[in-house]
């Protein structure tokens, strides 16, 4: 039944007429609560009325038999469907629930209703979240170029909304500005993207306990090159190459500059005692300084030298640079926050080495694995005495190890991670991004105190757990930045990760595209993902487009550098298509000679903690044939050439092998002496006789036959030998053992000669059956010929088999073999008995019988007689024609 309208309902609020329409939330209702109460009453009334309808079954079928009830149900059902369709149209859902021509099944109508309810409830939840201030649909901030900027159609919506929405919209446009000046263009030193090892940038080593190598000093960097061939190479790298050429290693200039200091570092006793957490100051009460000049950087370094600990964090950008750029550094002390513009002070950041390498000052990082490498790569900065809160969180077995979780756990602060992937190259930085960067280090020192306290309590008031965290942090400080080095086999690593099979042409295209991408990225100082992403490169290699437009079709969106150099890429694809097409190769199949095995496998098998003798071969590749381990003789900078290996007696890998019953190696003349144990084993093996070899002679006559057993009537061997006649006893008795090899050679030669003669005789003497039949009929006045040509062929085949069997049985030497001449044979023997009953089957190749019936004989003779000049008189080499029966 239809619910009563608001106008007809008696419980409508009486105050609706007294209040003006402007103050009403809905027409006839002053506030939302009154409307909810009224709507709830209507829903309850409708539910109660629907419950009073006849139930589906016998009762409903009975009422359905009355026309009035049927008409009432159809009318009310159409009203309900019409209302539901309007609601669905209002919410943008499919509203063809009333159209019986489109939706006829009840299940389909129910599915439409369920989908509409889901949409409505989802929208209600979104509106409730928006009303309560919780917005779950914040868009993540991505680097510029990844999203298409929104086009402003007109000017009326520029200043729409409240002030907060306006500020948020302006920030969004600022983050995704398309035109950003590349900061690499303003750097003093040129970025080194060459395909050479990374050279440390440090030239001054403060807090040093071991001096800096001479090759890394500033005097050596500024000194002109002594060798003219090294003018285009940095001085330190030229010295390294020269040392590799002359094999004179003076100092390892590629080692960690603070290796000695970190190896001998011990945490101060003040940090290994029970800490007293010091609460952080409020963000509004803490001063924040933006460092963008050299004087401010020097002042910052002086302040840091007077602190006992400070927190450090970095913001990095890697999408529009080959090696990446460190765009910002955040430093926080107990009383102040600093944000350093590293793009502006890139060449002067080495000043902070004095405070970062001071072993008396604790540097607090969170997840410093990448930060340590970025500091070395861009600024030549190194860290001594670091505490990594990420390692402490792992040691404490927290639920999560992220900084966001630590802020929520220890400080009760909800961090906003929408700027985590922002483009930090933007200058000037907006206020939101500065606030986000500041929060990363502002609370970190308090978290450091709280985690130290928990580690102290977990270690039973002993600094054991604290020392473990400092040890792990020290290992992170020892990490070194390594440049990506391109080789001819670099593409194989990416190819194996894709887990796809490519043929020779596709793999060649993949290799050429990988080399082109690496060269372009280094030259343009762009990342691999910006030049040509991996999935696009693999798609092009799989498709092998014939036209440049096909390359464009494989990329969506098309990278700018691909569009610029489309012709060069097309030439590479054509070069790959000219390769011969081979079968699909697996990633393991194209694996070439790689580096030497890991040094972790080089352990003594006798004293190792694990038994590695039965380890699978997948984890260890030993390319030597004698089970020894190859070791590299000399270190090599470039590994394209063949590396020489040597065998170390202390690193032999062998498995247990029982060689007692193995056959001796007689390749070197058979002079290998046998030990006593091997002689005994040989005697034992000779006593075991194969029963088949005892009465079946081998072709090479190398099988051992027991003479006593073969001539003993009581033995089974004697019975088998007499039954099967497989071995001639007389021949075995007469044949001397000394002449076995000579006899085998003679028999083989005689067998081959007999085969050749038999084949020649058969070819010469074998006359076609039809010609033989024609000759016989002409000379003997057309007597009855052979009954069946197939029988003759079978006889000939049997004779050939008999002759071949005779040829296989060698005759005694000296007896000549002469094949039988079948041309003088009488083939009447194959004609059969004249009294035999003729076959009931008709054979078209069979001649008519030459009897005394007169007419039949004459007709038969006329069939072969002279009819024209084309038939020769006498013999006919073309045989006889078929005699088909008349109808």
Swiss-Prot record:
Pfam families: DNA_pol_A_exo1, HRDC, PMC2NT. Residues 503-583 form the HRDC domain. Keywords: Cytoplasm, DNA damage, DNA repair, Exonuclease, Exosome, Hydrolase, Isopeptide bond, Magnesium, Metal-binding, Nonsense-mediated mRNA decay, Nuclease, Nucleus, Phosphoprotein, RNA-binding, rRNA processing, Ubl conjugation. Residues 1-10, 778-796 have a biased composition (Basic and acidic residues). It is found in: Cytoplasm; Nucleus; Nucleus, Nucleolus; Nucleus, Nucleoplasm. Induction: Down-regulated by mild hypothermia (at protein level). Residues 1-23, 734-757, 777-887 are annotated as: Disordered. There is a cross-link at residue 583 (Glycyl lysine isopeptide (Lys-Gly) (interchain with G-Cter in SUMO1)). Mg(2+) 1 binds at residues 313, 371. GO terms for cellular component: cytoplasm; cytoplasmic exosome (RNase complex); cytosol; euchromatin; exosome (RNase complex); nuclear exosome (RNase complex); nucleolar exosome (RNase complex); nucleolus. Disruption phenotype: Prenatal lethality. Developmental arrest at the two-cell to eight-cell embryo/morula transition stages. Oocyte-specific knockdown does not affect the onset of puberty but results in the loss of sexual receptivity and cyclicity and leads to subfertility/infertility in female mice. Rapid depletion of oocytes in ovaries and disorganization of the ovarian tissue. Its EC number is 3.1.13.-. It is an enzyme of class 3 (hydrolase). The record marks 583 as: Not ubiquitinated. The modification Phosphoserine is found at residue 823. One of its GO terms (molecular function) is nucleotide binding. Its main location: cytoplasm. One of its GO terms (biological process) is histone mRNA catabolic process. Expressed in ovary (at protein level). Expressed in testis (at protein level). Expressed in lung (at protein level). Belongs to the exosome component 10/RRP6 family. Catalytic component of the RNA exosome complex which has 3'->5' exoribonuclease activity and participates in a multitude of cellular RNA processing and degradation events. In the nucleus, the RNA exosome complex is involved in proper maturation of stable RNA species such as rRNA, snRNA and snoRNA, in the elimination of RNA processing by-products and non-coding 'pervasive' transcripts, such as antisense RNA species and promoter-upstream transcripts (PROMPTs), and of mRNAs with processing defects, thereby limiting or excluding their export to the cytoplasm. This is Exosome complex component 10. It comes from Mus musculus (Mouse). The gene is Exosc10.
